[in-house]
Amino acid sequence: MRLLGAAAVAALGRGRAPASLGWQRKQVNWKACRWSSSGVIPNEKIRNIGISAHIDSGKTTLTERVLYYTGRIAKMHEVKGKDGVGAVMDSMELERQRGITIQSAATYTMWKDVNINIIDTPGHVDFTIEVERALRVLDGAVLVLCAVGGVQCQTMTVNRQMKRYNVPFLTFINKLDRMGSNPARALQQMRSKLNHNAAFMQIPMGLEGNFKGIVDLIEERAIYFDGDFGQIVRYGEIPAELRAAATDHRQELIECVANSDEQLGEMFLEEKIPSISDLKLAIRRATLKRSFTPVFLGSALKNKGVQPLLDAVLEYLPNPSEVQNYAILNKEDDSKEKTKILMNSSRDNSHPFVGLAFKLEVGRFGQLTYVRSYQGELKKGDTIYNTRTRKKVRLQRLARMHADMMEDVEEVYAGDICALFGIDCASGDTFTDKANSGLSMESIHVPDPVISIAMKPSNKNDLEKFSKGIGRFTREDPTFKVYFDTENKETVISGMGELHLEIYAQRLEREYGCPCITGKPKVAFRETITAPVPFDFTHKKQSGGAGQYGKVIGVLEPLDPEDYTKLEFSDETFGSNIPKQFVPAVEKGFLDACEKGPLSGHKLSGLRFVLQDGAHHMVDSNEISFIRAGEGALKQALANATLCILEPIMAVEVVAPNEFQGQVIAGINRRHGVITGQDGVEDYFTLYADVPLNDMFGYSTELRSCTEGKGEYTMEYSRYQPCLPSTQEDVINKYLEATGQLPVKKGKAKN
């Protein structure tokens, strides 16, 4: 794969660091290091990594340091720096203004002749789909923890996502220069809260204001970071006062790795002293198996500990050939039988191309599609096929992205991440170079939205801009849903949280010149039944000529609490009372009828429709008959069932000074929260609670006022559970008032 010419790279200000900084490393020659003796970079020289963490742990600052030390950018800027430039990876104007990452940004760089593709992801729970997409296509990751905050609620979400996609990772405990930093506590939380077999690879030399450098436990040496920007790495003897601690921690590291690696375990039992290379190989094997997590230390803001972390990425994280990726082969005869096929990671054209579109974006270059290549070769000018739409696409342009800038390339191979232009597709689509191959990569896990608001443009003349912007956002973000409420004649948008929807409202105004009016947030309640209920329903329609006839018998069952968001259909029929070609029609009728519940108009979920028997007519039975029979059977069962309303419960984490503990606990109790745990460090306490989302609106204002602006909180979706009787009554009454079945109470405006 070629880059732009050397002159173009120089024009972009890449590949060179100012001589005045006393840079001690060789200048990176981008053009030269794109090639090996065979003409293509081997897999061993590639790493695809993501940087993920809780909000404000320092992910973007860390990425900025990585780009600077590898010669990718000539000057560093802070996320909320005084120069107003903002970090390179925060390319959206809104990101620079707020100092948070909203979209994943992709870039690539070089470290010690290895190509590193990096995706910097958001930490805020509302943008969790960006993290989900990044981890799906990466081979390894760096989990960033704050030395003060430790393991926080979004850290646990990222940990679950890494587990889902089996991503090996390193941990970097950042912000050792901050007051109250406690890396030992963060490590303990990794072991207790995340259940990781983790150990320090380094120990700090001083903490907070006295943080001078780190001690490398593998090589048994001290590492200092000199120069104005920490760019000169200097090695020295371990200070005398830290030698005993370094010996103890090194022994603990060997024990942890020996517990998860058989070869090192045997050496440990035989009381042999492992060499440095033995230890490194054992750590690599255990990290790739996800049975051990190496923990590194530093402070990205103070430019300490970043270069050893880069060395560790090369040393311990997998290259594309060490990760097994599977595609699903769907049979063409419409059978539900699926076969898993292992992708070949060879960097040549000996196998057909397979790639996954994991992110869509409309930038200044038009529609951008980010694709991870899993197999084969893709060249500029090639024709590829979208296996979902069965459409051919010719590639006019192929590029690699650096935040919002791009560099054209001629070809990409398995293991590369690239951007395609002007391609009509959806996030999660699979591309191949053979028509009707039936291959698809496992799709990205998309969580359901939990909050909705009504939205309309302030000016009626902006309707075209509004629909254009909303259409683009729904293509880019699968967690952002839009529908038109026919009863209230309004457009309703749904997403993962208030911030998520607020950001889209602001983007409509900034990017499309369409200011919007938003209504009050609405929670995505669900309805379900509390006990099994039988049904026996016949749909009959005779109006002269061919009629409609379908009979279904069975039982409607509630699902277990962990499956409250699901709907299941089970066919337990025998014989030919209901011909098999009509069973999918019954399922469709059931699913269609679940869109609106009888109690409050919200969706039905947590149900299993068990079809046991039925009847058909030789002439009058058809697909529509059994769709209507499925709908009628559900309505009949619900009329005889006891229903309850389910509400989303959020896992809330509040951090505030100790003197406000009483007020914070009282506030959570008032909001019907259940306190699940408590932590304390220095003068601050952390409260963990499960609180209904419906009761969390306006909490940020209350928390600020009761803690004098010193408290902060984060929350993420946890589960659905039956709501309180008072909440259920309130939700039902609001629905009856809105539909005119109940008079609106005096002094209360109709919602």
Swiss-Prot record:
Range of the transit peptide: 1-36
Alphabetical UniProt keywords: Acetylation, Elongation factor, GTP-binding, Hydrolase, Mitochondrion, Nucleotide-binding, Phosphoprotein, Primary mitochondrial disease, Protein biosynthesis, Transit peptide
Pfam families with a match to the protein in the record: EFG_C (PF00679), EFG_III (PF14492), EFG_IV (PF03764), GTP_EFTU (PF00009), GTP_EFTU_D2 (PF03144)
Catalytic activity: GTP + H2O = GDP + phosphate + H(+)
InterPro entries to which the protein is assigned, alphabetical: EFG_II, EFG_III, EFG_III/V, EFG_IV, EFG_V, EFG_V-like, EFTu-like_2, G_TR_CS
Protein EC: 3.6.5.-
Modification N6-acetyllysine, positions: 175
Example GO biological process: mitochondrial translational elongation
Keyword Hydrolase among record annotations: yes
A single GO molecular function term of this UniProt record: translation elongation factor activity
Residues given in the record as GTP binding sites: 53-60, 120-124, 174-177
Main location: mitochondrion
Cystine pairs: none
Domain tr-type G: 44-321
Compartments, as annotated in UniProt: Mitochondrion
Origin: domain of life: Eukaryota
Chain positions with Phosphoserine modification: 91
Family: Belongs to the TRAFAC class translation factor GTPase superfamily. Classic translation factor GTPase family. EF-G/EF-2 subfamily.
Functional summary from the UniProt entry: Mitochondrial GTPase that catalyzes the GTP-dependent ribosomal translocation step during translation elongation. During this step, the ribosome changes from the pre-translocational (PRE) to the post-translocational (POST) state as the newly formed A-site-bound peptidyl-tRNA and P-site-bound deacylated tRNA move to the P and E sites, respectively. Catalyzes the coordinated movement of the two tRNA molecules, the mRNA and conformational changes in the ribosome. Does not mediate the disassembly of ribosomes from messenger RNA at the termination of mitochondrial protein biosynthesis.
UniProt xrefs under PANTHER family: ELONGATION FACTOR G, MITOCHONDRIAL
Full protein name: Elongation factor G, mitochondrial
